[in-house]
């Protein structure tokens, strides 16, 4: 991790909430947000060993959310063809 990055699960949650896009943001913005969160939580899982499994849960959650958004974007693209 680079200097200044979250080192605890709590810090990661705060970063996620601070950078959360508006509810009406473009789905591609939400996709980038979710994928970034997944990377963040995976990195924190390696550092905050006391919350390793919980951080991995959140990484998986964010990946699932990203998968849903990606599927919606693909469905929209197919229907536009």
Stretches with model-predicted labels:
Residues 1-81:
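Long, non-catalytic architectural segments outside compact domain cores
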């Amino acid at each position: 991790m680079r200097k200044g990055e979250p080192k605890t699960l709590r810090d990661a949650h705060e970063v996620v909430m601070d950078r959360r896009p508006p509810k009406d943001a473009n789905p591609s913005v939400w996709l980038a947000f979710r994928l970034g969160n997944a990377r963040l939580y995976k990195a924190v899982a390696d550092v905050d060993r006391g919350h390793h499994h919980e951080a991995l849960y959140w990484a998986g959650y964010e990946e699932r959310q990203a998968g849903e958004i990606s599927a919606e974007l693909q469905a929209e693209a197919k229907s536009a063809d």
